């Protein structure tokens, strides 16, 4: 309630739904993005993110062609989870061909989405919204659904944080404690899939990786502790998202590209700041960090 009161007092009421959606997406991106960067599965998350367009396109086409009560958000979540499971199987069973198969899934997902969207009467408008984001027009129904997804992400990570750390740093630890590495890996990919859907409304399909990766990369330059990285990345996401929404509203420009540019500027400034401190740049997170940190 305090956050809602602050948003109402600081920003125009018209922007409140967009800012609320951006706040939830920023938290999700900061949390899950930290595990993605540390586990070094950015390319896998990129494939999941871009394959979402296939589910969005199919949902829009079914909605237009057969008047079915299916929203693009439903299509996005279904395709994201499906692709995450497919890529997880590829990673675990066909590691030597992983890059080629992931690239194929990435390409097919986007191709299917673009073909379906091309059959819609408002091709250019819809394609731009889902490629580059259009959070300024988020509906209350979408906001509730995004809130549920965000709560699911936060609750899961709060319960499973130690297991995810073990998965990222020490799989032998998991094996010795008889935890299923495969099951936890799939859970992380599914969380990544859900997060990409949440970020789709802020950044669009093409630019959402900047919200997953860049804030975490900035945070990793100044901290070794996972909890600090998650907190810093989430704050950076919130700041860049809020500023991007306000600038987009004032300048009448797409939100996603502005946020991506702000993220890039923040990353460049972090490089300069780190260099000015004359300290060596740390690796994303030290393997010697405690598993329960």
UniProtKB/Swiss-Prot annotation:
Coiled coil residues, start to end: none
Q: Which domain of life is it from?
A: Bacteria
Give a short account of what the protein does.
Part of an ATP-driven transport system TC_0696/TC_0697/TC_0698 for a metal.
Record flagged with keyword Ribonucleoprotein: no
Give the UniProt record's GO annotations in the biological process aspect: response to zinc ion; transmembrane transport
Disulfide linkages recorded for this protein, renumbered to the chain, are: none
Stated membrane topology is: Multi-pass membrane protein
Q: Which controlled-vocabulary keywords does the entry list?
A: Cell inner membrane, Cell membrane, Membrane, Transmembrane, Transmembrane helix, Transport
Ranges annotated as spanning the membrane: 18-38, 41-61, 68-88, 101-121, 142-162, 186-206, 242-262
Question: Which Gene3D superfamilies does the protein's record reference?
Answer: ABC transporter involved in vitamin B12 uptake, BtuC
Tell where it localizes. Answer: Cell inner membrane
Q: What is its main location?
A: membrane
Name recorded for this polypeptide: Probable metal transport system membrane protein TC_0698
- The answer to whether keyword Cell inner membrane applies is yes
Q: Which GO terms describe its cellular component?
A: ATP-binding cassette (ABC) transporter complex
